[in-house]
Amino acid sequence: MSVIDDAPGGASDGAFEAASSGASGDVFDDALAKDRAIPDLDWHVFPEGTERDVLEAPSGALARVRLGPIDGPRVILVPGVTGSKEDFVLMFPLLAAAGYRVESLDLAGQYESWQAGPGNLDPPRPRYDYRLFADDMIAALVDGAAPAHVLGYSFAGLVAQQVLVERPELFASLTLLSTPPASGQVFRGVKRIGRFSAGASPRTGAALLLWGIRNNLNRVPPRRIAFVRERFALTRRDSVNDIVGLMMTTPDVTAEVHAQPIPKLVAVGMHDLWPTEEYAAYALAIGAELRVYPTGHSPCETTPHQLTRDMLAMFAAAP
């Protein structure tokens, strides 16, 4: 979740046409209408038939949900910092109805995986690092049929790209959802305030992120912000600090990701933190298609039908 307006229908039809022309097909399809009709819902509730369990990952027990035919192709949706598996609750029935086995899990230190972390590693380490999140993602991928279609949301997309380079045989496709289109100190490209981020510490950056979310600068509906604030009671602050620090030191794997022959998709809202032009350049650099939606940082919440439509089209093109 960002501090950019994520309200459904927040962009004009003309703006949507400009953002989607040549990218998402027919602008006025039923996916757009369905996204505009999303109600203020209870984000705790997954579709009937959803299975809950835990994945025993290197960092500890990760809370997981799964839905869809057991023998269906796997789709793994990985949330970002301060997020959780519930961010994909609207995508679950759409992917399952299309015949896919859809899964999501909370990152170590986040929401219902709050007890997982570097202290559980062998040997223990002092901080949440990229290796921890990469090994946890690999554990999720190998716990079932491979290769799988992987979506990494924001920070998780940075991790997913590193895992793709390391273990390409585990990926059928890669979707980068609102993933920073940069390496190194990724916040430098954020609209308006990026130039002020150079001297910020991870703790300061995390504090600003949490302040924006808690104060609902996104203007999300009441039940959504209530759920977001509720999960902060479990999410470990040190995990947020460390992840923000990791986003300030992101490895550059652009060329290596480009070299992978799987289908790749960069999916982003036109009001995201980073400029659309930077996303377009990054998509070109890694050999990905670009899709832009009339929303902010959270298309999985606000334009899930359009996002799922475009992912399914990409899956159909996978070998």
What are these regions (language model features)?
Residues A61-G119:
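Conserved HGGG/HGGXW glycine-rich cap/lid loop of the alpha/beta-hydrolase fold
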